[in-house]
Amino acid sequence: MSQQQEQSPSLDDCLKLLKGERDEQRLAGLLLLTKFCRGDDHASIRRAYDAVGSQFLDRLLRTGMRKGPNGGSDNDNRDAYLQLSVTVLATLCRVPEIASSKEMVSKIPVVLEVMSKESVSPVLEECYEFLYLTSSTNEDGVTTLFESDGIRILASPISTFTDGSHLMELSMKLVQLMLSKVSLGIITDACLVEMSTIVAAIIRQFAMLHNALKFDALHLLSAIFSSDYSGPLKEELGRKTNNHWPDYLLIGVVAILQNRVAPAEKLHSLVLAETAISIMGERWLINPVKLPNMQEQVPPDRCLLLVLESSRVEVAVLLNDIAYLKYEASKNTSSTMESILSKRRHLGIAFSLVEKIIRLISTIGEEEGSLVDDNTFVKVINGLNETIAVVLEYLQDAKDHGQKKGDDLLASVRVVGSYLAETPMACKEKVRELLAYMLSVEGEDEPSSPFSSVCFLMPLLCQITMDFEGCKSLVSSGGHRAIVQCLVKLVGQNALTDSSGGIFLACDTVLNLLIKREELQLSMDASLYIDLLKALTYWADIFLLAYNSLGNKLCS
């Protein structure tokens, strides 16, 4: 109570000055306001704003910018006027009702202009504070911020800010606000280069910080890269690797995955890892980090092992959750369906990383002097074997429940096919047990008989049909019919793909079967092979390439 009594005269004096007729009185009142008004004293700030009025604040700001009638005549006081005006604006906007007012939103373009011309930290910080307070309380403020070249102005100084500074934090919050209101596609169409500069700066924060702002950066980056409109941004980042963003991203991902954090945070990090690989290639996982002033180097294989282990865990958890929701939870409720769709999206990230690691191991396994030693190689193979075993169990569960259609099932077949293409003998008994089922799996949008699942398994099928036992296993399951039907779709008049690689694999697989047809006692379905001959003829006419050996075998 005594403190309030001491402050009352100061507030009264301030209000009298703010209501004064002369500018000198009002200036003195504003100075007094910045001295004693606390940010949480909304009542006093509200009274001060009502006393001074928006018109005088506009005039003071424009004078500080040399835009008023006497703006250029008093250069000595210009900086002081500018500093005072933005400080007062930021102070007033601590009251949400003032910050969200049309008067304050209308000042956003002017404050952005100040930012584009000023490099003095105190002025900049007050400007950023004002922008955040106005934009976070009024959606029109966010729109005005973007339409007034906000992204370009934010991008200009962001790489010069100190790691973890208040300016950097406010910059990230402003970007997040704009993304919540404006589509990333619209933003990148308008200022792609500037947005890539901002993202690179945020990636550095994700790597270098060890506080809550690190996770803010993680969430913001994950949201950006998860957007359907992130393609152009990824391409632009691929053209500007000289600012070390791939190394910073690797450091941040490793820091999250190797520490005890919530599963959701690890999933966000996997999103970033998948993004980095899609831009830089699979070798990003094992590339040595080359950063100036790095005290502790990251071992070349650490990121690879952490990403694989985290992906393996995610696959196991997500498949278990999806199976529960599909087969045991309450059916056909909106919340159940939304949860399944969300988990499918997350599963797609984990599966994508597993496939990329498979490609990486396949490539480096044939190289000499690789950064991956034998011990790491064995760990990766063991991790992949465990992952594929879990996926096969999920497919077995789906088979037992009579489920053949679903994007999660098709994605499971794809990752199994990717691995078995490199190691056809892995999980041999389980694969042959499930082969017929996997060939029957369809995606949600496939209109008729299975196609994609057969294509995903074709590299495996081509390899196992090179020996009699593999052919026997395939024929006994009826898989040879699925292969022929797939080949018809690949080369027919309404071909579903233009991939010559898939066509040749399918042709070789059919040839392997036909060569051994007498031993297999393979019964010929005339109508099926007639359709294939017609399709091959059409394909040969189009590409001037007759696959004669296959045609001869069919007709012999």
Each PLM stretch: what is its role?
Residues 1-156, 160-199, 206-219, 226-247, ...:
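Elongated alpha-helical scaffolds that mediate protein-protein interactions in large eukaryotic proteins
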Residues 85-87, 127-129, 347-354, 412, ...:
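Well-ordered alpha-helical segments within folded domains of soluble proteins
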Residues 252, 260-268, 272-276:
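Leucine-rich repeat domain C-terminal region
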Residues 410-413, 423:
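Eukaryotic acidic, serine/threonine-rich low-complexity intrinsically disordered regions
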Residues 279-401:
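Alpha-helical repeat/alpha-solenoid scaffolds of the HEAT/ARM/MIF4G superfamily
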Residues 201, 252-253:
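Blade-edge beta-strand/turn elements of extracellular beta-propeller
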